[in-house]
């Protein structure tokens, strides 16, 4: 298994859990570039149809559904990504707009805090995509 981390400007990085030891320096492998001028705010893991997914909320690129089945064998990105995104694929979730916070509610739903264009906040339970 891997620990997955998302960082500003937005690499997705895997760290093999077996390599994590107390006090040791951790080196990860960048497996995706999810777009510049962006920051992930929340990331949840869920299972749907027998497959595992990440659902990632971002400041500038909306919510992304990322299948995890290719993570273990995904090659590291070691050169500049010359397109908007690169590495493991993802699917934008167009139905989730203005998401500021995201968490797993149960095995069928997420709970999201959204902000409308006028600034109003809503707390919603939504089906996992």
Positions of predicted regions on the chain:
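Sequence/structural signature of beta-propeller domains
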Residues: 1-129
